[in-house]
């Protein structure tokens, strides 16, 4: 289960970006610590209700386990969406699927494995652009949450190159030593783009051709 959570559903630095670690630790605490402690508290040899008490504790543990797994699965990042000038991390429970039938087939169903990189399509006319703006301002819904607006990431490479930021800027928002240490691992990285997440914003390193190199645990802004 640990491998599924930290290497498949939440790879790279996405455990920090989404803030799932505390939920997972709480889940482990309930199953590994609280359950056995409750068992010891109710255990009394010869007690008539002992079997019932232990059954209730086991059922509570299983309920907490399944609910925790469900919450982690629903909150996992499924799309890393390039939108205008940044990436946006979209979790499974944040997808707006009311027009999912209008999405391209490859974007109608989120992967059960690692999150996928995609980009958003520009508004086709002024009315659609206004609708997008009002939906985000008034409803808090970004077009990054709408799969019907997704296109392959390579279609946004020209825009990514126009919006890319110099690596030197990262030293304004992070410890200089940390930046140098991380960048030394990825010499092919020539620029970066911000990634907005619900817990901690991250940095996406890209190369000269706007290929994604790595998501790293550096702040892309103040």
Pin down the residues of each PLM region.
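Hydrophobic membrane-targeting alpha-helices
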Residues: 37, 41, 45, 68-71
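Internal/C-terminal transmembrane anchor helices
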Residues: 52-73
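Alpha-helical transmembrane signal-anchor/signal-peptide segments
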Residues: 71-90
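Membrane-embedded alpha-helical segments of integral membrane proteins
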Residues: 1-42
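Extracytosolic and intramembrane catalytic regions of membrane-associated proteins
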Residues: 98-222
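Short extracytoplasmic
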Residues: 32-37, 88-112
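Membrane-interface helix-boundary motifs at transmembrane edges
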Residues: 44-52
């Amino acid at each position: 289960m640990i491998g599924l959570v930290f290497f498949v559903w939440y790879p790279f630095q996405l455990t920090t970006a989404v803030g799932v670690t505390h939920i997972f630790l709480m889940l482990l605490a309930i199953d590994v610590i609280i359950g056995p402690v409750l068992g010891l508290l109710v255990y009394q040899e010869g007690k008539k209700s002992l079997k019932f008490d232990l059954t209730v504790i086991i059922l509570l543990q299983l309920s907490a386990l399944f609910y925790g797994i469900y919450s982690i699965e629903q909150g996992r990042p499924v799309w890393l969406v390039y939108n205008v000038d940044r990436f946006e991390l979209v979790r499974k429970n944040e997808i707006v699927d009311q027009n999912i039938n209008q999405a391209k087939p490859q974007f109608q169903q989120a992967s059960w494995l690692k999150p996928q990189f995609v980009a958003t399509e520009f508004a086709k006319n002024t009315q659609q652009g206004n609708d997008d703006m009002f939906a985000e301002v008034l409803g808090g819904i970004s077009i990054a949450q709408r799969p019907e607006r997704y296109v392959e990431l390579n279609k946004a490479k020209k825009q990514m190159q126009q919006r890319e930021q110099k690596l030197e800027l990262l030293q304004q928002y992070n410890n200089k030593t940390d930046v140098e240490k991380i960048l030394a691992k990825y010499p092919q990285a020539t620029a970066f783009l911000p990634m907005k997440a619900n817990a901690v914003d991250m940095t996406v390193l890209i190369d000269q051709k706007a290929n994604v190199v790595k998501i790293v645990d550096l702040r892309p802004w103040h």
